């Protein structure tokens, strides 16, 4: 009987160490997504300034610029693709607050865990699986804009799709780890 108690204690210690290590991994993921999200947030300023220049050039001087218009589009796409995981981390994505807002910490953790494992992660895995060949084809031909004076870097824009999915999946893993750790302590 004492042997089983020792074994149970050892398993509990190993389990605690594993969650400690997993929480450290979640912390690293959080730092990565936070740094990328904060850096990408500056693209909002770039988008606003470039759009302002475009409007002034068009309506005051009658000038248009395809490459500047595409730069605004690319910066806008990069802003959303690179900041989405950070938005997930800080709880900025839309959710049904009717149930979630009044739920206990345990229930919220359970919802977060199930949502990450059965909704977010499978969808991101499929998106990565489909987006990598899509981006690779674009890189293989160094795809450029269909407009003559457009940007010659469509392949970079398409690379943001699997990168977005990877960052979201990583942040989903971090959320699942934190939720599982919270559920384990209850």
Where are these regions (language model features)?
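Alpha-helical transmembrane segments and membrane-interface helix-loop junctions
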Residues: 3-186
């Amino acid at each position: 009987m004492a042997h089983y108690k020792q074994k149970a204690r050892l398993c509990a210690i190993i389990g605690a160490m594993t969650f400690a290590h997993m929480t450290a991994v979640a912390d690293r993921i959080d730092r990565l997504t936070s740094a990328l999200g904060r850096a990408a947030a500056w693209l909002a300023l770039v988008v606003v300034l470039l759009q302002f220049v475009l409007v002034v050039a068009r309506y005051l001087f009658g000038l248009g610029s395809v490459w500047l218009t595409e730069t605004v589009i690319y910066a806008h796409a990069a802003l959303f693709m690179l900041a989405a995981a950070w938005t997930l981390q800080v709880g900025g994505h839309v959710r049904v607050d009717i149930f979630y807002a009044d739920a206990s910490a345990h229930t919220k953790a359970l919802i977060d865990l199930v949502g990450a494992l059965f909704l977010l992660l499978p969808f991101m895995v499929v998106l990565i699986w489909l987006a990598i060949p899509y981006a690779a084809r674009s890189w293989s031909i160094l795809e450029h804009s269909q407009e003559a004076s457009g940007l010659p870097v469509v392949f970079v824009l398409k690379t943001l799709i699997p990168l977005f999915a990877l960052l979201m999946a990583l942040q989903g893993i971090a959320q699942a780890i934190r939720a599982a750790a919270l559920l384990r302590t209850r």
